Amino acid sequence: MVKSGQIRFPDYRWGEDRLFIFDCLERAGSVAVLPECKYSYIMHPGQSLISSYYDKKFEVCLAADTRAQQLCRRFGAEDDEDFRYMFAKSVFSCLTTLFSPGCRLNRNEKRDVIRGIITNEQLRERSRKPFGGAAVKLLSAVMRSGSVTLNYAAFRFVAWAGQAAPRFFTKLKHRK
């Protein structure tokens, strides 16, 4: 199915592809790297899955991280720093998209979502030893602070910075 391009995911969701890949890895008897790409995204002009608000994004983020941790344990990975980095960036996306034009939540609803995210035990555990550059470490510390107001202000600023200086923002967020 993979070789013939027969796998399709629902349009404009977040995370189904990661969960599918993790499920496949867990069930695979062997894994081979194909010489050409068999995976392509359909990108709609002006839209990005990372920058779009999706109300279940954090739930999918937690599920993908849980699966990644399970696979690391199963295959005896010494360190899961790349997965911790991916998780941190995914959570940052959950928080910054609260301030995107597509998010219709009011201020109090956004604060409730932030509270739910920053008090989540999995997030608190995984953000203790963040892997990444200064931006990842700083934003992880903000999340661990437990302050809804600080997180609201910080991630609102991050969302604004991403719109005001997208190239600089992209370089900064991809620094490991």
Where are these regions (language model features)?
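Membrane-interface aromatic/basic loop that binds lipid-linked glycans or pyrophosphate carriers
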Residues: 102-176
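Catalytic core of nucleotide-sugar-dependent glycosyltransferases
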Residues: 36-45, 51-79, 97-124
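Amphipathic alpha-helical repeat scaffolds of TPR domains
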Residues: 85-97
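Conserved nucleotide-sugar donor-binding catalytic segment
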Residues: 1-54
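Alpha-helix boundary/capping detector
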Residues: 28-29, 50-51, 94, 140-144
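All-alpha amphipathic helical-bundle segments outside canonical DNA-binding/catalytic cores
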Residues: 78-86
